[in-house]
From Swiss-Prot:
Keyword vocabulary terms for this entry: Coiled coil, Cytoplasm, Lysosome, Metal-binding, Transferase, Ubl conjugation, Ubl conjugation pathway, Zinc, Zinc-finger
The organism of origin for this protein: Mus musculus
Protein name: E3 ubiquitin-protein ligase TRIM17
GO MF entry, a single one: ubiquitin-protein transferase activity
Zinc finger (B box-type): 94-135
Induction details: By NFATC3 and JUN cooperation during neuronal apoptosis.
Length: 477
């Protein structure tokens, strides 16, 4: 008996005829056949449900010979347990060496199905027309293919490992660059913070000196006036007392009394009225920060006052044509003032836009934001109560007017380039002179009542021009 046949016989002896696998907890029936304990019990349980067969009480037929065997007579077969365990562990006795269907050695290889088969499988209908090779010949052929694949995969693995190393190096270098950039950002921002602290201290010192210098002049002027006021009070009191005396007493030394009044000369000090605080509220870099919120604001032609002209420089055309006689009075058009609003409304977020101005000597204008539902037909005060948060330039271009109290903000120079910053959530609108980066004024409140629109207004035909983005706006004269 050759080794293959011996292996086949040992596999047969160690194999359960019910599950066709190596024995697990084998037991022997009264008739001498062996089965897995679980397999024979399941077989007998199935037999209970079959009808038409009478069985002795507690006895069941053997699956091999059909001889009745008492269930309680099942005896463990420890020797077969060891044989089955040896068969599991021995490489030459693996179940995969036998055909699962025919329990024959797998000696052939079906190239069509790419699987080992036995001699019985080759004669079966399933494989009869397939290309079949001896197992060893197929193994040699496929071994060459596998070696080629292994060689290719090893080359690919080397490439992958090389790329992996490069990627790891790149990752490390990237993390180092990010770390360096982070440190640089922190360092530069720390420099900016220190610079701003120093600049704040410097500007406050300049303001304090300006305050003290002007305050000293004002106090000197006030002290001089106080002294003269006391002297005048004394002379006035003397004259009043003399005027109430008897005629004789009143006329005695009247010449000296009158000379005292004549000799007193009231010295009116030069009135110190500072036109404007020279120290500007200017934070370095603030305009650049605000420009990160910049919007491309465009005036809405349909909202423009009938004689307010809008000219688009890129397209070289009028957005609101020069009116012939009178322009159409739509519900969106301002008719009481030469005003217009932006095309886009804002109901959240932060927004910044700029307006350039080429104004004349008697310029009148207003800039800011307004509610989207403000009155466009009636003349109303442009105040927050009426839905306007705007600053106005009074005649002479030296004072910004703030409604509703007509508070005046005196300017050192008339602004020719204004920046407007809206922080909707904060309820704040701020105005800046882009020329020198100074802050001019802010409106603050708890919350805005609804969507806001950019607001533009020119006061008269000779007020000059406003430039909003690529649109130039002026009043037809």
């Amino acid at each position: 008996m050759d080794a293959v046949e011996l292996a086949r016989r040992l596999q047969e002896e160690a194999t359960c005829s019910i599950c066709l696998d190596y024995f697990t907890d084998p037991v022997m029936t009264a008739c001498g056949h062996n089965f897995c304990r679980e397999c024979i019990q399941m077989s007998w349980e199935k037999g209970k449900v079959k009808k038409g067969k009478k069985k002795q009480k507690g006895s069941f037929p053997c699956p091999e010979c059909r001889e009745m065997s008492p269930q309680r007579n099942l005896r463990p077969n420890r020797l077969l347990t060891k044989v089955a365990e040896m068969a599991r562990q021995h490489p030459g006795l693996q179940k995969r060496d036998l055909c699962q269907a025919h329990q024959e050695p797998l000696k052939l290889f079906c190239q069509d199905d790419q699987s080992p088969i036995c001699v019985v499988c080759r004669e079966a209908q399933e494989h009869r027309m397939h290309r079949v090779l001896p197992l060893d010949e197929a193994a040699r052929e496929y071994k060459l293919k596998l070696e080629e694949d292994i060689k290719y995969l090893r080359e690919e693995m080397m490439k992958t490992e090389t790329l992996q190393a490069k990627e790891e190096q790149t990752l490390t270098e990237w993390q180092e660059r990010v770390k360096e950039r982070r440190e640089r950002i922190l360092e530069e921002f720390q420099k900016v913070v220190l610079f701003l602290v120093e600049e704040e201290r410097r500007i406050l010192q300049v303001l304090k000196k300006e305050e003290e210098d002007t305050l000293g002049k004002l106090q000197d002027s006030k002290a001089s006036l106080d002294h003269q006021s006391r002297s005048l009070d004394l002379i006035l009191l003397q004259l009043e007392e003399r005027s109430q005396q008897e005629p004789l007493q009143m006329l005695q030394d009247v010449k000296d009394t009158l000379n005292r009044k004549e000799s007193f000369s009231v010295q009116y000090p030069e009135v110190v009225l500072p036109a404007a605080i020279k120290t500007l509220c200017r934070v370095p870099g603030q305009i650049e920060v605000l420009k990160s919120f910049q919007e491309d604001v465009m005036p809405d032609p349909s909202s423009a006052y009938p004689y307010l002209l809008l000219y688009e420089s890129r397209q070289r055309r009028y957005l609101s044509p020069p009116p012939e006689g009178s322009a159409p009075y739509s519900k969106d058009r301002f008719v009481a003032y030469p005003c217009a609003v932006g095309q886009k409304s804002f109901s959240s977020g932060r927004h910044y836009w700029e307006v350039g101005m080429n104004l004349t000597g008697d310029a009148l204008w207003a800039l800011g934001v307004c509610r989207d539902n403000v009155s466009r037909k009636d003349r109303v005060l442009k105040s927050p109560e009426n839905g306007f948060w705007v600053v106005q330039l009074s005649k002479g271009k030296k004072q910004l007017s703030l409604l509703p109290n007509s508070t005046l903000v005196t300017l050192t120079e008339p602004p020719s380039h204004m920046g407007i910053f809206l922080d909707f959530q904060a309820g704040e609108v701020s105005f800046y002179s882009v020329n020198d980066g100074s802050h001019l004024h802010s409106f603050s409140q708890a919350a805005f009542p609804g969507p806001l629109l950019p607001f533009f207004c020119l006061g008269a035909p000779k007020s000059g021009q406003m430039v909003i983005s690529t649109v130039t706006m002026w009043v037809k004269g």
